[in-house]
UniProtKB/Swiss-Prot annotation:
GO terms for cellular component: plasma membrane. Its main location: membrane. Belongs to the glycosyltransferase 2 family. OpgH subfamily. Involved in the biosynthesis of osmoregulated periplasmic glucans (OPGs). It is found in: Cell inner membrane. It holds the Pfam family Glycos_transf_2. This is Glucans biosynthesis glucosyltransferase H. It comes from Escherichia coli (strain K12). The keyword Transmembrane applies. Residues 1-139, 215-512, 591-602, 701-847 are cytoplasmic.
Amino acid sequence: MNKTTEYIDAMPIAASEKAALPKTDIRAVHQALDAEHRTWAREDDSPQGSVKARLEQAWPDSLADGQLIKDDEGRDQLKAMPEAKRSSMFPDPWRTNPVGRFWDRLRGRDVTPRYLARLTKEEQESEQKWRTVGTIRRYILLILTLAQTVVATWYMKTILPYQGWALINPMDMVGQDLWVSFMQLLPYMLQTGILILFAVLFCWVSAGFWTALMGFLQLLIGRDKYSISASTVGDEPLNPEHRTALIMPICNEDVNRVFAGLRATWESVKATGNAKHFDVYILSDSYNPDICVAEQKAWMELIAEVGGEGQIFYRRRRRRVKRKSGNIDDFCRRWGSQYSYMVVLDADSVMTGDCLCGLVRLMEANPNAGIIQSSPKASGMDTLYARCQQFATRVYGPLFTAGLHFWQLGESHYWGHNAIIRVKPFIEHCALAPLPGEGSFAGSILSHDFVEAALMRRAGWGVWIAYDLPGSYEELPPNLLDELKRDRRWCHGNLMNFRLFLVKGMHPVHRAVFLTGVMSYLSAPLWFMFLALSTALQVVHALTEPQYFLQPRQLFPVWPQWRPELAIALFASTMVLLFLPKLLSILLIWCKGTKEYGGFWRVTLSLLLEVLFSVLLAPVRMLFHTVFVVSAFLGWEVVWNSPQRDDDSTSWGEAFKRHGSQLLLGLVWAVGMAWLDLRFLFWLAPIVFSLILSPFVSVISSRATVGLRTKRWKLFLIPEEYSPPQVLVDTDRFLEMNRQRSLDDGFMHAVFNPSFNALATAMATARHRASKVLEIARDRHVEQALNETPEKLNRDRRLVLLSDPVTMARLHFRVWNSPERYSSWVSYYEGIKLNPLALRKPDAASQ
């Protein structure tokens, strides 16, 4: 069999159509497929003429009228995006110097926006009312938190062993031996550090406690009259003048899962009858060439199966500027002016049509809302770790989300996905300038969502959480190490954001959001320092002789004291703050029904197991987050390349590599404390033994087999597992379908396979006008690639080839026309098997 016959056999067409094609050479085949009978100056450009025919062979249902167009050079091109209508979107430079801002105000140059002027009188009154209520509520929260912290800190001071604070006079130590002075001061310096850290950490815990408590009351009693969800009935028709874009920025994601969730979401939107009000944009920043080709294939299949031509678009950026935020900004500049709203989706997001329509209705009912964040529910994972986290977020999450809404109202959080945004003010106010300066906290902003919410609020637009709007879903990391990789990015981003704490015009609530974002990770090293100082104090107490006389001519000694009853009382009250939100959560479930959680006994047992699990993981996260914070401040780059895992499980080798130092620290800490004082080891036991067990917990919790076993036992059961909503059922069904027809080694198939080459050629975006310089560059790229083995062709060079329709056509022609010359490519491709279902429907392929 010659190569021409093999080439024809690779086409997904009937035998009669194959027989009609010429068998003489590859060029003749392309000429026969070219309905326009074009002539090409170069022989290896002939595949460009057959692109349309090859696309129609493989994806006939994806090529509606107008889907295939001509570029400026007459080459066939898939119209994957609508015509751009550009808008101006540029950032204002950050001004973080409060002295400079004060000087501007003195000179009358303060340009703080007067946003209320755009509202009607009735809207202004409503706006002022909830803002006043929100301010009062937050003052109450501040008073409660600080009062609780002051009482607890004073209580902590009374139970520390060294109580000679008032007798220490530095002037009395002048002329005294330095070592004696140091030993006198050391216990009190340690205790001072302990008290300061205790106050900060207790304040942090207290704020969370009051947030959960108010969320509990909110959910138990019913709606707050200031809830944004109360502003609509829920069945109002959508305004046809206000169109919404569903945008999904992706980067090297699981293609099968991305398009399964997106299809389920779109099918749900169609079921509402409101699909005409929505468009979908898949905004790819992927830089893995194999994934890029797989995305193109999945997009073609998606628009064919849902009839999405003209409504579902795909674009891959060649210049990945500013990561996700830059991708969204790029969409806004090119197509944002065509839409009133946009809903940002993550790669794992799934939303029901009712939820999306509900968000649009809320936007239309609240003309001063800039961002409305839904409350996504976690579901869809099977590992023990993920199921435990899903259960925790499903049980405790509603309390904290409702509590956040209670305290913040329309000056709330935006989490970067599953939220609707008013496009015009976003374009005008939410472009992000890079942070000035040098170092690890300068440059492009990493955690863009909090900053965009702060800028939206600074411009006078509300940022709300629709915490009681159902139908919003996401997925969690499958194991601890994957979660920590994500935390590494979030930690750095939140630390960077704190530089904006003093930026001009930021609302106090969003300054507090920046502070809480930092504390989410800074609390870890603070907790570690608290434990270290407590241990050091115990070492001093055990190994040194107490200083009974701190002043000259002191009549009575100062005895170190130990008051275990007070220590236990303080410990118990702190535990109440930590664990009462969990108890309130389970009380709420007991009151409203436990059936969807497996019943009374199973949900209670699941709660106890989750508490144990969180106790085991807290010290592990503490140490990792401490490393993340320190590395960010020191400018260290933490390299974390985890191996690919088919079942999302952590291997023993990787676990001991990541957790080995923690295990060693736990052993040394435990042995040292046992040697010094067994009683103190009792207090440290939850921490040191968690560190010792960390590799074992990490591995076992990452196993899907263990997670599925708990699912069969109805432990960690959530409503989405007990009675899955249709959109999640569809996601699983589409995911299985996509996996059956998945495409691996996409770049090599785009070079060799006639159908995938046509797809890559038609979707290539580097469509320059002809020039001699460009032709020389193209020939150089093609020759250099073919003169090397495919294994040596790196990612960036593959992307350059994949982005140019001419280079893809020439590569395709040469490997088929001269297989002997490019034998290394041919032999490499022969070792790759194309999924037989990749080019046709599974039922058709099996016939």
